């Protein structure tokens, strides 16, 4: 589904019955979360709250929620068309494109080179276009007008310490870098013009800030936060885009049109011209604050830690902006649905590097990425362990995967009954368990003994080959195909 911007996407979702307008007043304090959570768990539409209130005070802008509440809407956001509701095939095609761009194979001859040329031409033609004026700068708040209380920012859970900006697309650029980094980092509201930027040390924004501090000690670091962006750009920020391709360029490929950018009014950072709201400001070195606690995608409240403070100098927006928001909680939530959809993008990327992989699955119940199940065409003893370590190190997205289960290709890995059968019949607890200590772990994983550092486990649930066992290995029970066909033919007569 091709679209121009977030508003065009909303219109098309509504035409498909994938968006519901809520005209009744709904409070951004807890009520909005409860409604969005019930609708998402039922597989319902995106929601546009037209009359948000904050503790009884009416807000001027509508709130968009559950935009990516189903994998089907994620596929639509990536510019794909769905045939008969099939969202997996189009997302696999996106993954195949990324795999090709990440590691393009040398052409096998002139004809092959000619066939691949349009792909490279399309990538080159999708370089972002800078414009001088933009809808996102139609209204400008500066000085005393900057007040985050004027935005309908959600307070998601009873134990949350303050309202939280959840879908902020954070734009940064490190010193000497041409390419900007886009990342999604939550932001706790401290005051009318200050929020806490919760980015983990290995994330792109944090790395840009670290490099800036080393190169320009004592100078403020420019940051822009986009609230309400076209879906392709948001998804580009959470997709493993090759380093040779900018997220803005990838978004253009998905949308089928160049991403138009406009320079921020107070810095050289560029933001999507069609954005709804943009926060412009700086992070001052040494300016930090205690962040949290907040309910997170784990289903728990996270511990309190120090993170940099983002001071907002200016807020620019459309004349009638839409505030884009979400909540995170025990799966299923919107991040879980995103993870379910991106799972299909990951499969071709993994298969390009490891052709023996048949399928790969990140169960939503595993908090999007903490547990992975992979099936392989096993070729030699120890093969499963090679695949485990390959997955842990292949994409940044898998750095925090705590558990990997490897099975043979006769196991349907998206059926837990099949996976549990393989685990209980093909695993010896000592021989087939791989434990790796002192590895990077999600900061939010309170089960690890040290913040951001913990252990990983791999389980080899494949059939064992000579060299892996000295015993005769069991053969699965399978009915004779001729008998099955004969019973199929008589089935109606049996009255069963």
From Swiss-Prot:
The keyword Transferase does not apply. One of its GO terms (biological process) is ubiquinone biosynthetic process. Keywords: Cell membrane, Decarboxylase, Flavoprotein, FMN, Lyase, Manganese, Membrane, Metal-binding, Ubiquinone biosynthesis. Mn(2+) binds at residues 181, 247. Its cofactor is prenylated FMN; Mn(2+). It comes from the Bacteria. It catalyses: a 4-hydroxy-3-(all-trans-polyprenyl)benzoate + H(+) = a 2-(all-trans-polyprenyl)phenol + CO2. The keyword Metal-binding applies. The active site is at 296 (proton donor). Binds 1 prenylated FMN per subunit. It is a peripheral membrane protein. GO terms for molecular function: 3-octaprenyl-4-hydroxybenzoate carboxy-lyase activity; metal ion binding. NCBIfam families: PRK10922.1, UbiD family decarboxylase. Homohexamer. This is 3-octaprenyl-4-hydroxybenzoate carboxy-lyase. The gene is ubiD.
């Amino acid at each position: 589904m091709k679209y121009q911007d977030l508003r065009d996407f909303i219109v098309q979702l509504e035409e498909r019955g994938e968006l519901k307008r809520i005209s009744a007043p709904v409070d951004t304090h807890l009520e909005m979360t409860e409604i969005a959570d019930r609708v998402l768990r039922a597989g319902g539409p995106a929601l546009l709250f037209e009359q948000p209130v904050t503790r009884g005070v009416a807000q001027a802008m509508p709130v968009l929620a559950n935009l990516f509440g189903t994998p089907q809407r994620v596929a639509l956001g990536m510019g794909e068309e769905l045939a008969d509701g099939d969202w997996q095939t189009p997302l696999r095609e996106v993954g195949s494109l990324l795999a090709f761009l990440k590691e393009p194979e040398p052409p096998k001859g002139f004809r092959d080179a000619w066939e691949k040329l349009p792909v490279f031409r399309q990538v080159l033609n999708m370089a972002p276009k800078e414009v001088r004026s933009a809808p996102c700068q139609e209204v400008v708040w500066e000085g005393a007008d900057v007040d985050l209380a004027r935005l309908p920012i959600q307070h998601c859970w009873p134990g949350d310490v303050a309202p939280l900006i959840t879908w902020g697309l954070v734009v940064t650029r490190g010193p000497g870098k041409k390419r900007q980094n886009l990342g999604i980092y939550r932001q706790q509201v401290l005051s009318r013009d200050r929020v806490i930027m919760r980015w983990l040390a290995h994330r792109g924004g944090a790395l840009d800030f670290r490099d800036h501090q080393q190169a320009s000690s004592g100078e403020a670091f420019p940051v822009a936060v986009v609230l309400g962006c076209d879906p392709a750009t948001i998804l580009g920020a959470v997709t493993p885009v090759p380093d040779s391709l900018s997220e803005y360029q990838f978004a253009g490929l998905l949308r089928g049109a160049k991403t138009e950018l406009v320079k921020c009014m107070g810095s050289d950072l560029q933001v999507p011209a069609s954005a709804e709201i943009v926060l412009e400001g700086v992070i001052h070195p040494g300016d930090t604050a205690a962040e949290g606690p907040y309910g997170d995608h784990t289903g728990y409240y996270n511990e309190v830690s120090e993170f940099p403070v983002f001071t907002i100098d200016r807020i620019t927006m459309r004349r009638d902006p839409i505030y884009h928001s979400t909540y995170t909680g025990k799966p299923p939530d919107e991040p879980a649905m995103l993870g379910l959809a991106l799972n299909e993008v990951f499969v071709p990327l993994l298969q390009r590097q490891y052709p023996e992989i048949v399928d790969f699955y990140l169960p939503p119940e595993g908090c999007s990425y903490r547990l992975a199940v992979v099936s392989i065409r096993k070729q030699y003893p120890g093969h499963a362990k090679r695949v485990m370590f390959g997955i842990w190190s292949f994409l940044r997205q898998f750095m925090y995967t705590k558990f990997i289960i490897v099975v043979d290709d006769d196991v349907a890995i998206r059926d837990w009954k099949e996976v549990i059968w393989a685990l209980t019949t093909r695993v010896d607890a000592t021989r087939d368990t791989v434990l790796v200590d002192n590895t990077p772990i999600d900061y939010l994983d309170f089960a690890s003994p040290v913040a951001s550092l913990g252990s990983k486990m791999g389980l080899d649930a494949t059939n064992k080959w000579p060299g892996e066992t000295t015993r005769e290995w069991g053969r699965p029970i399978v009915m004779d195909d001729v008998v099955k066909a004969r019973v199929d033919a008589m089935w109606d007569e049996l009255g069963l």
